[in-house]
Amino acid sequence: MIISLRFRFLVVLLVVFLTDQAFTAFVFEDTDDPVLWMCMQLLTASMIGLSALYLRYFSRPMRTWYFVMLACLAALALESRIGWDTWMVYPHVFNKLLVIMPLFAVYGFYRRYGMPPLGLLMAFLLVGLAASLVINFPEALSLASFVDNERGFNVESTYLILLLALYYFNQYVAKGGLPRLLVFFVALGMIGFLQHRTVWLCAVLALTLNILLLRRTAGVTLSFQRFLPMFVLPIVVALGGGIGVVLNNPEVVARLETSLEDIQNPDKQGTGSWRLQQFRSYEPFILEHPVAGMRLKGFELPIQFYATDSKLKVWKDGTGHHFHSWYVDRLFYFGVVGVLLVLVMPIRLVIRRLRHPEPLDANSAAFLAFLGSSLLYSFSYDWPYYMYSVYGFALAIMDPLPVAAPAAYQPRVPRRVRRTEEAIPSTAVAHADA
């Protein structure tokens, strides 16, 4: 009996996913716990070492990108040394570049070892997220929280549920199995119930991209037998689970209508208007430093965002500016260069892969659709720590190392013949030829 040990290759990606609050909540009640912060720094340092260890497995574009990132870190350290007489005056700003390093570590590791058993990883995430909801955030599952718009489960953890939904949907389309389809619908239902409207929009975009990618995915069966349960199962679950009764609740309907209105009017109501006010507070500084941003001086800038009711600063000075948009965060600290530094190479590599005639596999399609949705997610939130590793993993599995050609067949020469040939001097062979 042969036991596969490929599950050990999940460790790198699994450790990164464990940094999400849904999992850290089992150990740390406070997200600002200094021990948790130290663990995150140690993980980042380990990822830097891992990226250097597997550098030889990088493709040429990825290797170039890696050295550009190191050059940017060196330039930032030099700026700190010249202006503040220390090599790392504000770690908060340096971390915005260091957090990208897990992308290279995960890319190099999985380009070296190939696709791990993703089914085991996704099952772990599924059980872990469900357990965290029930144990650590039970208030998020109550109907009262839904009506009052109390989001117990944070947006980063909810966004991770979308990756699960994409994976199990593609597995169902490729291999069938009603349990996979059921997990997909339950995941979508939880995304809707947890009320993070940004994730709602990301789910619509990701599913659209995923369906387009499935058209050129190998092993996918787009048949009537596959699609029929997609329409029947939600109806059965809705009737059997009492969802129709819940939707008849006027408070629930009012909450859904309010959420849809917030999506339709992001500049006038809801958290969208709050983000717009934050952006306008910093817009002059972004426009004043459009190319490379304010960098270290940006951290010294006092908080510019004030609450509309109390006219007080939303956060304390010296704690960062807490941007609720990845784009605004990058533009403020590093300008247009900061945005392009992260996005240009992945977009280029994805486009090059999609232009290649070789079909995708179901896993690659799911991860690429998830990456596409991150471009929309970035308008509303900063990237979670695991997002960079997801980028690295997706780039690795869609561009694996080329398989070496098998060695040419050499017929086996009998030992007696070899001894005879070795016994004949080369000079004798030459005289014989003459």
Where are these regions (language model features)?
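Membrane-embedded alpha-helical segments of multi-pass membrane proteins
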Residues: 34-52, 93-105, 154-165, 201-208, ...
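Aromatic-anchored transmembrane helix interface
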Residues: 36-45, 61-80, 84-109, 120-129, ...
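Long extracytoplasmic/lumenal interhelical loops at the membrane interface
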Residues: 265-288, 292-334
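A membrane-periplasm/extracellular boundary helix in multi-pass inner-membrane enzymes
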Residues: 193, 211-265, 288, 432-433
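Transmembrane alpha-helices of multi-pass inner-membrane enzymes
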Residues: 166, 345-346, 366-422
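Hydrophobic transmembrane alpha-helices and their immediate junctions
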Residues: 7, 332-375, 407-409
